[in-house]
């Protein structure tokens, strides 16, 4: 999955992404025995017994310094979806939607009041998915500057 995602993004933005090294990739991608806890979630989607996609998320606790922060969300538990991927053959078949909805339900059950994620701004697939399909709103911009 990481190889396919890396290849896709390397094609659309070769200066921002690269194809991951294949050696050791499978072992690095396998969830550990403690992948699902009260604060961490890994979901795997299958279609007709075949791997179709995955999602990784975590429950972020309220920040102790939230009263000093300008973002009110930081004072509450938040669901952070840090990885979502589906094989291209399963795009637009509801796999990613079901994964995100399951993660949101998991977060809600644990007290999360908001769900957050990040994605590549230049993606013609993920931006419409998150904004139009799932109802997420843009709230921040991540800036980057090479130092070497």
Language-model segments: which ranges?
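Conserved GNAT-fold acetyl-CoA-binding loop/helix
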Residues: 3-31
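A short helix-loop-beta-strand connector motif used in the catalytic cores of GNAT acetyltransferases and
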Residues: 27-44, 62, 80, 137
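Conserved beta-strand in the GNAT
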Residues: 44, 50-59, 80, 85
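Conserved acyl-donor/pantetheine-binding loop and adjacent beta-alpha core of acyl/acetyltransferases
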Residues: 56-80
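Conserved acetyl-CoA-binding loop-helix of GNAT-fold acetyltransferases
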Residues: 83-86, 92-105
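Conserved beta-strand-loop-alpha-helix junction that forms the acyl-donor binding cleft
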Residues: 91, 116-127, 144-147
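Conserved GNAT acetyl-CoA-binding A-motif
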Residues: 100, 107-119
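Conserved active-site tyrosine of GNAT-family acetyltransferases
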Residues: 130-131
């Amino acid at each position: 999955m990481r190889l396919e995602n890396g290849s896709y993004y390397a094609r659309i933005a070769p200066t921002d992404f690269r194809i991951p090294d294949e050696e050791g990739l499978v072992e690095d991608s396998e969830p550990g025995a403690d992948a699902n806890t009260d604060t961490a979630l890994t979901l795997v989607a299958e279609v007709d017994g075949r791997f179709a996609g995955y999602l990784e998320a975590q429950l972020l606790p309220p920040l102790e310094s939230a009263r000093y922060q300008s973002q009110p969300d930081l004072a509450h538990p938040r669901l952070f979806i840090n990885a979502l991927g589906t094989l291209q053959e399963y795009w637009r078949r509801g796999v990613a939607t079901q994964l995100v909805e399951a993660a949101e339900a998991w977060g809600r059950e644990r007290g999360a009041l908001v769900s957050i994620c990040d994605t590549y701004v230049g993606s013609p697939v993920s931006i419409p998915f998150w904004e139009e399909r799932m109802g997420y709103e843009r709230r921040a911009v991540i800036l980057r500057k090479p130092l070497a």
